[in-house]
């Protein structure tokens, strides 16, 4: 979910007032085709703007399905820092015969790592929620009514990111 937070909406008028940035942006768009596909141009409110974001619109929509899924990240109190799916299916990584795992661990940690704090392994963590809300506001400001998502996932209720 963290890549969702790397987003900014820049009015084209602002870009034009920054000739060095505009020159680099034009070079980037002309030469970095794979990465440039993540830059969207459109209207933000009443003014032409550019959306600079890590996920493309298609990836954003896929990520939002997980973010807004109550079986995954969305909870009655905020967004979990790790999907609840990992409660029954821990993430396991094998590196040269050594096994590493991350469990969904709400509340007190089952290990002494990081002082026993398990905030980054499941429960709602204020810093992540703050960053996600700010990012979703930016996406919502850029896409407006042109992007609707099901909230919560599976409910059939469609809404904009501004709602």
Where are these regions (language model features)?
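Acidic, mature catalytic/reactive cores of soluble proteins
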Residues: 1-163
